[in-house]
């Protein structure tokens, strides 16, 4: 009953105090997506769709339909990868420099307050910020790497669940698998 009581008191705690307590326990993970890199110049999905579609020979009606459809990002990217030899769209994920979000993650990691960073981002801005801060980390982004990770070991792990711009072929495979799951569900 004491454990339950302690848990309930943490829930009623001031949110900032709660987060501070959790970070100080060094048991924290951060999960982040596309928005974290937006201020670094990496475009969000709607902007990517507009850029891609503006470069294709399509009529306005078809372009509008594709812009307004609820197609998952992964499926859109899979269609793009499979139907065009132009891979320059992937260069969009190589834009920018780390912003305050990436620097904050690196500072938390440098202080030993993080165990894992999980991201859906293809860009390498988190890694760049960690390198700049002198933080050692294990990068995990290929499917075959997940089975060999010692999740209990110390040290920061950066998990890129959609792959990395560093390995464009792996991104295509990941996108295909995720978009396939989206269609099945």
Language-model segments: which ranges?
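Conserved catalytic-core helix/loop/strand module for nucleotide-ribose chemistry
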Residues: 2-185
